[in-house]
C-alpha cells in the first residue's frame, strides 16, 4: 500500500492548498466590497470639483493656466500606469500592460517619446524589464492608499506638462465593470477635454455668481490640480476593486479545481485500495484451495 500512502499524502497537500485559496477568496470578497464603497464615496467629491472648475473656466476664459491648454503639438507623451502590487489576480495586469505597450509602440512609430509614472509594482517591474523611461513611481500602496502617497509622482508629471516638456498625459488602468468583468482602460487626462469643461451644472431658472478669495484665477488653478488628482485616485480605486474581483474569481477557480483534484485522487486511492484487497483475497483463496 505504498502507492496508497503517497496518494493520501497528496490528498492532504491539496486540501491544505484548498484551505488557503478559500481563505484568499473570502478576504478578496471583503476587500472588494470595501473598495467599491470607497469608489462610491469618492465620486461626489470629484464631480463637485469638476463643476466648480468648469464654472470658473467658462467665466475666466483668459485664465492662462497651462493645465487647461487644449491644443498642443504632440512631441512627447506621459503615461500614468496603474497596476497592482501583488499577483494572483488572473490576467488583470497582463491585459493593462498589453494595451499600454501597444499605445507606446504606436507613439514610437510616429517618433514620439514617452515618460511614465508607475503606480503599482507590477507595472514598474514590467517597464524596467524592457527599458522604458520611468520618471517616478509609487509602490506598496496598501489596501487603503492615501493621496499623499501619490502627490510626489503626480506633481513631477504635471509640472513637466506645465513646462511644455510633455504635451499629452494618458491614464492607464483596469476599470471595474462588475465582479466577473474588468476591462483595461486608457483615457486622456491632459489636455482636459471639452466634455469636462462643459456645462458646469444643470440648467436652472436661477443662477448665482460667487466671490472667490483670494481671486477666481487662484481658486481655478488650485481646483484644476485637485480635479486631476481626484481622477487619478478614482482610477486607482477602480483598479483596486478590479484587482480584488479578479483575485476572488481566480481563487474561487483554484478552490474548485482543488476540490475536483481531491475527488479524482480519492477515486484513484479507492481503486488502488480495492485492487489491493482483491489481490489479497485471491491469494488467501488460492492458498486455502492448495491446502
Swiss-Prot record:
The record gives the membrane topology as: Peripheral membrane protein
Q: Which InterPro entries match?
A: ATP_synth_F1_ATPase_gsu, ATP_synth_F1_gsu, ATP_synth_F1_gsu_CS
* Gene Ontology, cellular component aspect: plasma membrane; proton-transporting ATP synthase complex
Localization per record: Cell inner membrane
Q: What is its main location?
A: membrane
Sample GO molecular function, one term: proton-transporting ATP synthase activity, rotational mechanism
**Sorted alphabetically, which PROSITE patterns does this protein's record hold?**
ATPASE_GAMMA
Cite the CDD domains for this sequence.
F1-ATPase_gamma
Q: Name one GO biological process term.
A: proton motive force-driven plasma membrane ATP synthesis
Q: Provide the alphabetized UniProt keywords.
A: ATP synthesis, Cell inner membrane, Cell membrane, CF(1), Hydrogen ion transport, Ion transport, Membrane, Transport
Q: Assembly state and interactors?
A: F-type ATPases have 2 components, CF(1) - the catalytic core - and CF(0) - the membrane proton channel. CF(1) has five subunits: alpha(3), beta(3), gamma(1), delta(1), epsilon(1). CF(0) has three main subunits: a, b and c.
NCBIfam families named in the record: ATPsyn_F1gamma (TIGR01146), PRK05621.1-1 (NF004144)
The role this protein plays is:
Produces ATP from ADP in the presence of a proton gradient across the membrane. The gamma chain is believed to be important in regulating ATPase activity and the flow of protons through the CF(0) complex.
Similarity comment text for this entry: Belongs to the ATPase gamma chain family.
Question: What's the name of the protein?
Answer: ATP synthase gamma chain
